[in-house]
Amino acid sequence: MRAVDLIQKKRDGQELTSSEIQWLVEGYVAGTVPDYQMSAFAMAVYFKGMTTREISDLTMNMVKTGQEFDLSAIEGIKVDKHSTGGVGDKVTLILAPLVASFDVPVAKMSGRGLGHTGGTIDKLESIKGFQVERSQDDFIKQVQNIGVSVIGQSDQLVKADKLLYALRDVTATVDTIPLIASSVMSKKIAAGADAILLDVTVGEGAFMKTVDEARELAQTMVNLGKAVGRKTVAVITDMSQPLGRAIGNRLEILEALEILQGKGREDISHFICELAQIMLSLANVEKTVEEVRQHLENGQALKKFEAMVLAQGGDLEDLYRPVTVDYVVEIPAQEDGVIEALPAMEFGLFAMRLGAGRAVKTDALDYETGIVFEKKVGESVKKGEIVAKVYANGKISPELVTDFQKYVKIKMSDETLKTREIIEIIS
């Protein structure tokens, strides 16, 4: 078998056999298929796509290139959740302990942020002492003991994906559904959970720009999960504006704590309760959204989060401290009206300029910096009223303030704009 023949076959729109896909994946990890040929194959997939069977074969062969976590020692149905990424996405910080507070074990591996999108692991590392690198044994013991753990992805997990993702990143082949689906699901399958909730974001701040694209990706991943016996549900969610009020690692921890105390904004609190209801249902625990919400209001979810922080070496006193920055700049509205748009991509990149995100993987983060919105889409505002606060450790230039104000779209209208977080559920 030769890589060039498989590249040509896919370039011409033909279907690869299971053995051909296995040979290609194994050869790439072993180094016998070089980067330049794998990048050509990825580009062929970008233009010609893959069948459902090909994607399934690719995914399972990728799983076999690394360690597979065995969570069978944990009693009950283990649930996991994945988001395709967004801005201000602190959902896991609240959702994992909330679901665990119903005695459903949550064993989750999360990633780091890159570009305009944030990463759960970076947010947790903003807590003094919090350890995200844990052995498989420690991970399992923690879930057995307190019901929840969120750790960084093991380097030993799905080696093919690590290699292929780095290649796709520099060859303009990131945004192709077969390769996104196989990347996400190979890691979720290898992580060992019995049931998976997929949060497929769509809109200005997401990889998927249209609902049709998001639906295709969601259905592909749900089919992959079901094919290997994992209960899988996907929700298509709106990422046209930042999620919640805060963007930035430490700021998002503080917002998560507000929500875990039942004090968060109604829109994000309700959204997370809806996601928790779906995750609980995957574990055969049927609750109403209001029953789920009670665990935010009565402190049970917060206790789980605090227990996880302590179990992973975090400092509870540091957990609740306010951010410490050199400058806090208030951004006023430039006119009366209704907030029509807060483009998630623009504000994600703005936060990155403050040090809250990475332009490249080697960039150091400033955990304290970021943005807190006082107004969100659909809310009325008067000229001069504060729309947001910018937290920075370097002086903020007038040009930066002007950029921020330019991104805030205000509509001259008395009409109240409706926003929705969950657009569609696919199971």
Regions found by a protein language model. Give the residues of each.
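Acidic, glycine/proline-rich low-complexity segments that act as flexible tails and inter-domain linkers
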Residues: 1-88, 307-311, 426-427
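Well-ordered secondary-structure scaffolds
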Residues: 5, 10, 15-17, 28, ...
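Alpha-helix C-terminal capping segments
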Residues: 47-48, 93-107, 187-192, 227-228, ...
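Glycine/serine-rich anion-binding loops at beta->alpha junctions
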Residues: 77-100, 104-116
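Short acidic, glycine/serine/threonine-rich loops at helix termini
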Residues: 92, 110, 117-122, 154, ...
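Short beta-strand segments
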Residues: 109, 143, 151-153, 184, ...
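A glycine-rich helix N-cap at a beta->alpha junction
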Residues: 123-149, 219-225, 229
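Phosphate/diphosphate-binding glycine-rich loops and adjacent basic-rich segments that engage nucleotide
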Residues: 144-193
